[in-house]
């Protein structure tokens, strides 16, 4: 940590480096004195592990599952899924479209799925709210589609004092009437 702090603050002068190293050391000393040591020792893993962001994993999983059409409107934090598809789709034979809004994204994947193409979109809470009429349309026509809701930490763009999976309630009750749906949430 000390080396990282030195590298990060070197251009700001030795006094800034010393202050940051001192604060980090004081925090470490306080924690060591005030808290018990964590009793679990993780075994070393001799095999390197791949690390992916959640949005990358969504894209990779969708491609592995045979998705051949992806349409979306960029909405944080789901935009990374669109970026992943845009960067990798050509090599995988996947058609990608950035459309004018979330309503268009939902309806265009319904059209693609009606032709037998595995189709998907991703959005976040506000975007999914706009898609709910299309959810009902897909149910009425019995056309299977995949809609990913990359949840924010709370209402709107999130609440700084708490986190939740608030979009889950919206997804569970999306559209009108009862129809089969598969909802997966961590």
Across the structure, where does each feature detected by a protein language model lie?
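Glycine-rich ThDP/TPP pyrophosphate-binding loop and its adjacent helix/strand module
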Residues: 185-186
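Thiamine diphosphate
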Residues: 3-174
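Proteins synthesized as precursors that undergo proteolytic processing into mature forms
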Residues: 180-182
């Amino acid at each position: 940590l000390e080396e990282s702090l030195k590298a990060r603050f070197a251009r700001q002068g030795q006094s800034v480096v010393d202050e940051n190293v001192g604060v980090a050391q004081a925090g470490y000393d306080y924690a060591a004195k005030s808290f018990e040591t964590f009793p679990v020792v993780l075994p070393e893993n001799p095999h390197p592990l791949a690390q992916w962001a959640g949005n990358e994993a969504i894209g990779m999983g969708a491609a592995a599952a045979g998705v051949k059409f992806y349409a979306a409107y960029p909405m944080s934090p789901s935009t990374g899924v669109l970026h992943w598809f845009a960067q990798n789709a050509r090599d995988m034979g996947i058609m990608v479209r950035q459309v004018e809004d979330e309503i268009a994204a939902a309806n265009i994947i319904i059209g693609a799925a009606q032709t037998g193409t595995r189709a998907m979109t991703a959005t976040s809470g506000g975007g999914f709210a706009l898609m709910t009429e299309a959810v009902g349309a897909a149910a009425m026509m019995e056309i299977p589609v995949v809609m990913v809701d990359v949840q924010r930490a709370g209402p709107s763009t999130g609440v700084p004092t708490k986190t939740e999976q608030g979009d889950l309630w919206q997804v569970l009750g999306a559209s009108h009437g009862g129809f089969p749906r598969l909802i997966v949430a961590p």
